[in-house]
């Protein structure tokens, strides 16, 4: 094996060895020997030995039921540890240049200088920089909070062991600590026994903030400030807020009946409690640090005649935060809160802390001011009094149901049956009216009451506590106006961003038309104050039309929305609903952002970060700093050095690719009569529905086919059996079609000169590398009826043909040539993922033979699902 990744390899083998010790202690030498045999066979089978592959299959088939779980857990833990070693490697001092992101910000600044971008323009772009990451729960984030805390500690140990001057006894102590942590992880329950509640999911999100972002954001801003100072001669203004966090956990009720208005209220209280708790730790640290006496008159006035003025001010804040925790505790328990002043607004912290900061600078103690105090000030700007801003998300028909029920009660007809024009007239009329619309004696159905109650919870909060109100499956202008009306009726005292989410192919194509219609309404134009947010859906459009077609529809919609908002002088923020997978838009962030249409990042970036991707991108402070550097540099680059406008012939060819790929995709998914039975038999789709993975059901409609499946289980199921079908189906076929029609040279030009197109192909390469046709065939043979085998065979042949077509256009000999680290990292994990796949196929075979699944087999199955998800990385 090449020397390139020696440090990583040695960490992987050390962690593997320690895990082996744990397995031996827990289950004896015999089981460890079995795990080792399977691992070695997997390695040689991967290298091409058919004999060893057959031996591996037999070895797994012969495992007794009671060994399935420990063997599955062994490989699952191997993968978790490999992922951690790899994540650590990207921030370690041994990291190779092509692995560690080179310093993205400095690289960008030298690019800007070479392109003669003025410092004035750069400074302006920095002032406007806005990165908002929206944390969303994710059924496939199988790692529990318990495990996440252990991951952070394991990283600390790896970091210690890397120090050159570590003493022998210190090394010994650290290795023992590592072994303890690995043993703790082994003996903890990896998998949740019950479905997490929306409250559990929110707590998971807060744990990420506490363990990583609380340190990571000020750390990033400190580095960013130094880079700016070096390049522009001026740093980041103290009150700048380039990064902030929002969340859907506890606010996203689309298709999730468990997220009620009560849950939303509770999550918002918890969020404020967590913020106060974290600030209190900061303030206590500052009390111990700021023992200085000299101060300005302003601070003297705030502190009174205390000898240590800074401490006096900080102690007042300590009391404020203590009272806040007490009051929120009482509210969460449903008790009467004590009547004390509590934290409701970030300025209550900012003003006194900023006064201390200015005073220290004025008195010649700038070096002290720029330490922990500056970090706390940056946190106050980034996290506010609420830690994260909560979005509300609801499906469009839930709002029209309210209005239908209401209009029927009022005797003026059925809102749902009206034409779009009549709906708009009614809504605008009511929005402009001074009298309330909801009658006092009206008793709505429970579903309608729930929507009204949610709007009331929104109206009780402060504007700072909330992000936007997202309408999923938005199709028309009336969908947006309806929400504005319901919020107005609930007495909402501020203007909340109401954000339509366009997610199917048709809705994306019509998004411009819908927004034009809204902007032509005088009431609406006046109300939005020239600011509009629109969300682009990635997952449902890909499930509807395949990745190539969906990707082009998303690009075209963004372009059209930028154009219409520019014409109307409206500031547009595009909100991207991209998940971790390729089928759901998950290209590596930097590449994905630079492949968007020109001007689409002018209003900043707002993007959802999901469960398992939160852990990979933001799970450790140093990793989060890297991610923010990439986001910041990509946004600045996109705004200061915009990508080229696509040539007309590129667009024309993209239209063809889109049409051909959509047809090829739908011919299989909708046209093949055997497709649904094949999907159900060859993947763990049915079993996934039973697992306690997320708080929301896997289906919108329990009886429907593929179209009723949520996008996440749809993609997740296919990544489990390694065919990863939704992430490539249709794309390669369309490329081959265009080559056959004589467009090879044009495709090659697009690949060289158009970031949008080259990113698409790069994503396809990564998917192809993760596919394993041989494994998918094994699932077919073990699990599906013989009559379905030809369909699986056709799909695998198509996959091989598609790979050839993409490599042909890129002029590459093999996949991921330009990303050796990415390819190495997939290779490293395959040795552990393959046995898990075989175990899973075996478990599916055994459980499907039984009337009643034994808990033992069910647990083993869940472990394989978690392990394969960890091994495939961007899973769902």
Swiss-Prot record:
It comes from the Bacteria. GO terms for cellular component: cytosol. GO terms for molecular function: magnesium ion binding; phosphoenolpyruvate carboxylase activity. The active site is at residues 138, 543. The keyword Lyase applies. HAMAP family: PEPcase_type1 (MF_00595). This is Phosphoenolpyruvate carboxylase. It comes from Aliivibrio fischeri (strain ATCC 700601 / ES114).
């Amino acid at each position: 094996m090449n020397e390139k990744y020696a440090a990583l390899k040695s960490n992987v083998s050390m962690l593997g060895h320690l895990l082996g010790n744990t397995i031996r202690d827990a289950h004896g030498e015999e089981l460890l020997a079995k795990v080792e045999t399977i691992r070695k066979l997997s390695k040689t089978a991967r290298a091409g030995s058919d004999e060893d592959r057959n031996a591996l299959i037999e070895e797994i088939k012969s495992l007794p039921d009671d060994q399935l779980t420990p063997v599955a857990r062994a490989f699952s833990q191997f993968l978790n540890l490999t992922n951690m070693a790899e994540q650590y490697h990207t921030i370690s001092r041994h990291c190779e240049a092509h692995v560690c992101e080179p310093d993205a910000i400095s690289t960008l600044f030298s690019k800007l200088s070479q392109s003669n971008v003025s410092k004035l323009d750069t400074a302006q772009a920095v002032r406007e920089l806005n990165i908002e990451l929206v944390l969303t729960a994710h059924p496939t984030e199988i790692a529990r909070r318990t495990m996440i805390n252990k991951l952070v500690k394991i990283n600390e140990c790896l970091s210690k062991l890397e120090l050159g001057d570590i003493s022998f006894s210190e090394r010994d102590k650290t290795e023992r600590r590592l072994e303890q942590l690995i043993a703790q992880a082994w003996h903890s329950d990896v998998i949740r026994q019950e479905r997490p509640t929306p409250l559990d999911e929110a707590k998971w999100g807060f744990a990420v903030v506490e363990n990583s972002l609380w340190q990571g954001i000020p750390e990033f801003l400190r580095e960013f400030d130094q880079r700016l100072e070096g390049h522009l001669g001026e740093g980041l203004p103290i009150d700048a807020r380039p990064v902030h966090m929002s969340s859907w956990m506890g606010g996203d009720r689309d298709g999730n009946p468990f997220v009620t208005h009560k849950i939303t209220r509770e999550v918002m209280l918890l969020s404020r409690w967590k913020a106060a708790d974290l600030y209190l730790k900061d303030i206590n640290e500052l009390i111990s640090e700021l023992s200085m006496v000299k101060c300005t008159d302003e601070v003297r006035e705030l502190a009174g005649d205390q000898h240590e003025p800074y401490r006096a001010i900080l102690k007042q804040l300590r009391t404020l935060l203590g009272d806040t925790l007490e009051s929120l505790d009482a509210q969460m328990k449903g008790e009467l809160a004590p009547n004390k002043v509590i934290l409701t607004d970030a300025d209550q912290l900012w003003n006194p802390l900023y006064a201390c900061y200015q005073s220290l600078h004025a008195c010649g103690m700038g070096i002290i001011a720029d330490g922990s105090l500056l970090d706390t000030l940056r946190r106050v700007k980034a996290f506010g009094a609420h830690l994260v801003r909560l979005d509300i998300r609801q499906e469009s028909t839930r709002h029209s149901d309210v209005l239908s029920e209401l209009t029927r009660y009022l005797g003026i007809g059925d809102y749902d049956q009206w034409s779009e024009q009549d709906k708009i007239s009614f809504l605008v009329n009511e929005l402009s009216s001074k009298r309330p619309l909801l009658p006092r004696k009206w008793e709505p159905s429970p579903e309608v009451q729930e929507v009204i109650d949610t709007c009331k919870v929104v109206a009780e909060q402060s504007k700072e506590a909330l992000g936007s109100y997202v309408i999923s499956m938005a199709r028309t202008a009336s969908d947006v106006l309806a929400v504005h009306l319901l919020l107005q009726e609930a007495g909402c005292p501020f203007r909340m961003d109401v954000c339509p989410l366009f997610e199917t192919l048709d809705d994306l194509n019509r998004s411009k038309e819908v927004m034009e219609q809204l902007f032509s309404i005088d009431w609406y134009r006046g109300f939005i104050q020239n600011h509009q947010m629109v969300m682009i859906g990635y997952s449902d459009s890909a499930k509807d039309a395949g990745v190539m077609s969906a990707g082009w529809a998303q690009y075209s919609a963004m372009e059209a929305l930028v154009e219409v908002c520019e014409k109307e002088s409206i500031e547009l923020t595009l909100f991207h609903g991209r998940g971790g997978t390729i089928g759901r838009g998950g290209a590596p962030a930097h590449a994905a952002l630079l492949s968007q249409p020109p001007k689409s990042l002018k209003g900043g970036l707002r993007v959802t970060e999901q469960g398992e991707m939160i852990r990979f991108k933001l799970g450790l402070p140093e990793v989060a700093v890297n991610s923010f550097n990439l986001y910041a540099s990509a946004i600045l680059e996109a705004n200061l050095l915009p990508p080229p406008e696509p040539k007309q012939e590129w667009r024309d060819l993209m239209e063809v690719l889109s049409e051909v790929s959509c047809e090829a995709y739908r011919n299989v998914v909708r046209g093949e009569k055997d497709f649904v039975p094949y999907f159900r038999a060859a993947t763990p789709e049915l079993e996934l529905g039973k697992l306690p993975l997320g708080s929301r059901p896997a289906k919108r409609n329990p009886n429907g086919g593929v179209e009723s499946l949520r996008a996440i289980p749809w993609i997740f199921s296919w990544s489990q059996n390694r065919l990863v079908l939704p992430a490539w189906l249709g794309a390669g076929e369309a490329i081959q079609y265009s080559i056959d029609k004589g467009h090879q040279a044009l495709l090659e030009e697009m690949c060289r000169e158009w970031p949008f197109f080259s990113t698409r192909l790069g994503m396809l390469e990564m998917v192809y590398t993760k596919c394993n046709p041989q494994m998918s065939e094994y699932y077919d043979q073990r699990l599906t009826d013989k009559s379905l085998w030809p369909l699986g065979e056709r799909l695998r042949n198509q996959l091989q043909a598609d790979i050839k077509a993409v490599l042909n256009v890129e002029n590459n000999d093999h996949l991921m040539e330009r990303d050796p680290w990415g390819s190495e990292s997939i290779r490293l994990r395959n040795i552990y993922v393959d046995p898990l796949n075989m175990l899973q196929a075996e478990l599916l075979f055994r459980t499907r033979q039984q009337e009643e699944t034994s808990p033992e087999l069910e647990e083993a199955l869940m472990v394989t699902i978690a392990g394969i998800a960890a091994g495939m990385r961007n899973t769902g």
